[in-house]
Amino acid sequence: MIVLPIKSEEAVPWIMQKHYAKRLPSISYAFGLYKEKKLVGIITYGIPASNSLCEGICGKEYKEFVIELNRLCLLDNAKNQSSYLVANSIKLLPKPKIVVSYADTAQGHVGYVYQATNFLFRGTTKERTDMSAGEGKHSRHATDPSIRQFRSAKHRYVYFHGNKTEKKLLQRKLNYDVLPYPKGETKQYNSGGKVETQALLFV
């Protein structure tokens, strides 16, 4: 297996067909997992929608380093493919970066892929309702306060990508306690979606 950069457009069919959210996030970086020259998975990273989130992790001074691992889609979720894709795509990101990601409890996700790749666990968000902008749109685009959308609890993970000095500095600046990993049964979901995969001509 090999992880390579791909165009963000190549990730779109995977996100819309294979990911449960069915919504396009902000994409700054996209990478593909190739097995025998066939694209079998994608991962994307983008700027978080919440500026307060970016400022809150390590402070305003480091908010520009924050990036969210916002989509991870695999063709068949074969053993170790998800952790391999996460670990090796992070290596391709510029340094330093503060990588955040979430495991949605409503989807039965615990975040074992993040635990396997040495992310730090920083707690769980509370269930809440937000203003809704309609299906497939982020709540930041909402304008009608009477239209509400349920937000499930999510496990929050963070990873510091950089050299030893940068990683130590960022971890010291972390404004959250590092907590023991959550445990529980992970549910597998099948979106039923299909994507046409492109063969890699040259490796």
Predicted regions and their residues:
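Acyl-donor binding region in acyl/amide transferases
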Residues: P5, G46-Q149, Y159
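Extracellular structured ligand-interaction cores
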Residues: S28-A30, A116, K154-R156
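A short catalytic or substrate-binding loop motif that flags glycine-/basic-rich loops and adjacent residues
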Residues: R23-I27, Q149-R151
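Conserved beta-hairpin
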Residues: I15, S28-Y45
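Short, cationic low-complexity segments
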Residues: L169-V203
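Short amphipathic alpha-helix that is part of the acyltransferase structural core
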Residues: M1-P25
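A conserved mid-domain beta-alpha-beta active-site/ligand-binding segment of alpha/beta enzyme cores
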Residues: S146-L169
